[in-house]
Regions:
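Active-site-adjacent "subsite" loops/lids of carbohydrate-active enzymes
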Residues: 17-34, 106-179, 229, 233
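Aromatic- and glycine-enriched glycan-recognition loops and surfaces
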Residues: 32-50, 77-101, 167-171, 246-253
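Catalytic domains of carbohydrate-active enzymes, especially glycoside hydrolases
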Residues: 38-65, 179-183
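Conserved, mostly hydrophobic/aromatic
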Residues: 47, 55, 98, 169, ...
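Aromatic-lined carbohydrate-binding/catalytic grooves of carbohydrate-active enzymes
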Residues: 50-86
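Glycine-rich, aromatic-flanked loop segments that form ligand/cofactor-binding clefts
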Residues: 52-59, 63, 90-148, 186-189, ...
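Aromatic- and acidic-residue-enriched segments that line the glycan-binding/catalytic groove
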Residues: 67-79, 113-151, 189-228, 281-287
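Aromatic-lined carbohydrate-recognition surfaces of secreted/lumenal glycan-active proteins
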Residues: 104-114, 186-193, 226, 237-287
Length: 288
């Protein structure tokens, strides 16, 4: 289904301005639909005709491959068994047509997912350099599981606490902002995959640095799993959630600094969870 998100935003003090009306073009859902330029033009014209004034172009879904000309990442050519090779620049064509129609453009990328566990497709399944850099899950049976092996997860997330992962993600942002004339950059999946991640040695060490002291009996001192799948809080339970929120918010600050160092007119946007029960598990509990 091509229309995945409609959002209107209202800001105090801007009553004299036209309010943004966004239409989000998801990369995966529209992979086959937008195999041709004509189709992109058709839907952008439709969007304009019904009152939208800004479009969000998703160019890096959960696979870690992309729909723009990149020197960092390979092109996305296969989704759900459908193979499409484009000899034209998907993102640039969206921008050109949007400008023709007077539409603003937000570009969106999935920040930390780089593979699809259900099908073993994507960057982290194809390149060994990502071994040990994906999230490590602490499962209800008390075991540790590489997220690449968890078929239930929406994406195989890289570990956001790692400096090399953050540097890699920032390089993607930098490449797009330098090479494409966009109005805004939206961070999608800029979070943890869930409350069972990440329990790697990297996160253990970073958590100790955050607290300023050693954390023994990890992860039991964070929490243990009860037989019914609920959690039994440990000594550092609350500190753990605050730490994870800080991992994400500090990265968002880095992205903002990077974008504005290149072009301070490009706005930073963020696809945030609206479900209150999920924000702690995903590191989006900013009030912490």
């Amino acid at each position: 289904f091509f229309l995945l998100l409609f959002a209107t935003c209202s800001f105090a003090g801007n009553r004299g301005k036209e309010q943004p009306k966004y239409l989000w073009f998801d990369a995966e859902a529209n992979f086959e639909r937008f195999a041709s330029k004509d189709s992109i033009s058709y839907y952008l014209e439709k969007a304009k005709s019904v009152g939208f004034n800004q479009v969000v172009v998703d160019v890096k879904p959960i696979y870690g491959e992309v729909l723009y000309k990149s020197k960092i990442l390979p092109p996305l050519t296969t989704v759900n068994g459908k193979v499409i090779h484009r000899d034209w620049d998907y993102l640039q064509y969206f921008i050109n047509e949007a400008r023709r129609l007077g539409l603003k453009v937000t570009v969106s990328t999935a920040m930390f997912p780089s593979g699809h566990p259900a099908t073993n497709e994507g960057l982290v399944y194809e390149e060994s350099r990502w071994d040990g850099k994906t999230c490590l899950e602490y499962t209800p049976d008390g075991k540790m599981l590489d997220i690449r092996e968890d078929k239930k997860k929406v994406g195989a997330f890289l570990n956001p606490v790692r400096k090399d992962v953050r540097k890699f993600a920032l390089s993607i942002v930098r490449e797009i902002v330098k090479n494409y004339d966009v109005d805004a950059y939206a961070l999608d999946y800029c979070r943890y995959p869930g409350d069972d991640s990440d329990f790697s040695a990297d996160s253990h060490k970073a958590f100790e640095h955050y607290l300023g002291k050693k954390v023994r009996n990890f992860p039991d001192n964070i929490f243990t799993w009860n037989a019914d799948g609920t959690k039994n809080p440990g000594v550092y339970y609350k500190e753990w959630w605050a730490f994870r929120a800080n991992v994400i918010t500090s990265f968002v600050k880095e992205v903002r600094k990077e974008i504005h160092s290149i072009n301070n007119k490009v706005e930073l946007e963020y696809w945030a969870a609206s479900w209150i029960h999920g924000i702690y598990g995903q590191g989006q509990n900013w009030a912490s």
